[in-house]
UniProtKB/Swiss-Prot annotation:
This is Poly(3-hydroxyalkanoate) polymerase subunit PhaE. The gene is phaE. It is found in: Cytoplasm. Poly(3-hydroxyalkanoic acids) (PHA), of which PHB is among the most common compounds, has potential uses as a renewable, biodegradable thermoplastic. PHB serves as an intracellular energy reserve material when cells grow under conditions of nutrient limitation. The keyword RNA-binding does not apply. It comes from Allochromatium vinosum (strain ATCC 17899 / DSM 180 / NBRC 103801 / NCIMB 10441 / D) (Chromatium vinosum).
Amino acid sequence: MSNTNFFNDDWLELQRKYWDNWTDMSRKAMGLDSASSSATTPWEAAIDQWWKAMAPAAPDLSRSFMEKMMEQGKNFFRLADTFAKRADEGNAGNGLELWTKTLEDMQKRFSGSLDDGGNTMQRLMSFWELPLDNWQRMMSSMSPMPGDMLRNMPHEQFKDSLDRALSAPGLGYTREEQSQYQELMRSAMEYQAALQEYTNVYTKLGMKSVEHMGSYIQGVIDSGKTIDSARALYDNWVACCEGAYADEVATPEYARIHGRLVNAQMALKKRMSILVDENLGALNMPTRSELRTLQDRLQETRRENKALRHSLHSLERRVAALAGEEPATKPATALRSPAPAAKAPARRRTTKTNPAD
């Protein structure tokens, strides 16, 4: 009896359920309810249903791009729904109080993201997610651990205790290895602190965007104009976010924070590379440094061989010139002139003679 169907269908389904259960357990452990991540508006639900129907047929290269586009559409409906709910709950005639209360709620979402590891910000304010997501993908590709394991790790609670533990000297015949692991932990803690500072910058950017949006709405109210559609509101919200981002990244403080993050990441990568090379060497496998040395030596050998060929051809030409002869062979790098095409031999014209003549 063949078990092909079991391994093709049932086994994959079992694996999917296994990881789904682990995901649900991790979300419950972090205080995240699965219902809170569901669609909050009918338009979001419609977008989700449409994407579920179209996602299997979408190419892999464009699937991530389409997911970002779907998220932008959801943000549009969330923003419109936020202002619409506030208008339904309060007095629609008092427009200034309505806008002020709504912007205060949005600003509280940003300030709350400092305490819950960024989960609140990813709900409505996910437009700042792309730069952080690109950085996390890069770190995940460099790290032996899956994902960015240091993103939400608490730092201030046990920093002093961990520093004291890492300052202990190594003992025994493994003291060198112990010191290397201590340096790795110090580099990891420095990178984690730099990453949290970098994440807080984007949280402050969100709060500044809300302030810019409040100034824009106040100007609209003072001028007596009206906002005709949710699309115009969303376009101005995006413009406020882009303006806040452009102002922030041009400051020396952002350059310092970003430079600290890059330096910490490179130091952590260097420590990881050293430990990986030592483990590979213990297994009698070629390490990264050995492969790099081999590549450098091969390149040097190629250059030396090329220089020797040129010297040999130069000597051949000199010997041939002294002997008054042409060299038997030409350098392989010499350009050859195209040989002229041989002409076909001319055919003799024969004239017929008349027998009478």
